[in-house]
């Protein structure tokens, strides 16, 4: 799993925290950030430079027969797919954690209100005698 990341020398893909992608001239620059260890100020990162793929395609303008376009490198596309899987998984885990915490807070509120209601009923019973 994560063969493309491993081919880049990333031996522990599960340590990937996030990534950024930018275009610089005819290159795409991919920067991968890893989770910080305790006591570190900055996250470790690695940078990769991919040349953009040049393609000649039929022009939609009738007067010009062909035009040259630049596209993302196919290998980079595969790497980004794997990075998206990793980063999305982390987001799903965070969302699930947030949902569980919200459910706990709601349950706590419901139980607190129910206890107050029962105590009020008990108070009515003891004061009624």
Swiss-Prot record:
Matches recorded under Pfam families: DUF3461 (PF11944)
InterPro entries per the UniProt record, alphabetical: UPF0325 (IPR020911)
Family to which the UniProt record says this protein belongs: Belongs to the UPF0325 family.
Protein name: UPF0325 protein YPO1040/y3141/YP_2811
High-level lineage: Bacteria, Pseudomonadati, Pseudomonadota, Gammaproteobacteria, Enterobacterales
